[in-house]
Amino acid sequence: MYHLFHSRLCLPQGLRSLLAQRMPAAKLLPNDSAVAAYARHRRVVAVGDRVSETLIRHGVKPWVMVFDCVEARRDKTCPSIPEGYAILRTRNERSTVEPGAVEVIRKALRQGHTVVRVDGEEDLLALPALLYGDVGSVVLYGLPGKGVVAAAVNREAKLLAMRVLEFFEPC
């Protein structure tokens, strides 16, 4: 699976509508309270500014937070970072998965209590988080206008993430 990330991968137009939906077998959490309740006793990887902010505001400390300080294509204040968290930075262009960003995600997943601050866009980094996350953990990411997707990291989710990434094109 690592061979996928030797070069930048671009999201093909045909996959955009698929990725704008909830993953099969994932839960859709409709509001902040549901997100916090679901995440409270789990190892969570939060992908996105709003998801990260929601968890921190409700006293949930994610294992890893990935955000870009942009929401709906507008700059915003970065989520607050809990004391004791390491901060890693990476670059990831819009509609891509960059090899360097994947390596930073893997490092963050290994060490935990880490923020990955993305220059560019973090949305598609939920896929490598699923691919490399520990079985039993959960990846939370926003689905604009619908809520937050909670995708359990298990064998099936890893295979699905890998299959989706295999449709991306080197660019």
Swiss-Prot record:
Annotated GO biological process: coenzyme A biosynthetic process
One MF term in the entry's GO annotations: kinase activity
Pathway: Cofactor biosynthesis; coenzyme A biosynthesis
E.C. designation(s): 2.7.1.237
Family: Belongs to the GTP-dependent DPCK family.
Name the record gives this protein: GTP-dependent dephospho-CoA kinase
Pfam families according to UniProt: DUF359
Enzyme class: transferase
Physiological role: Catalyzes the GTP-dependent phosphorylation of the 3'-hydroxyl group of dephosphocoenzyme A to form coenzyme A (CoA).
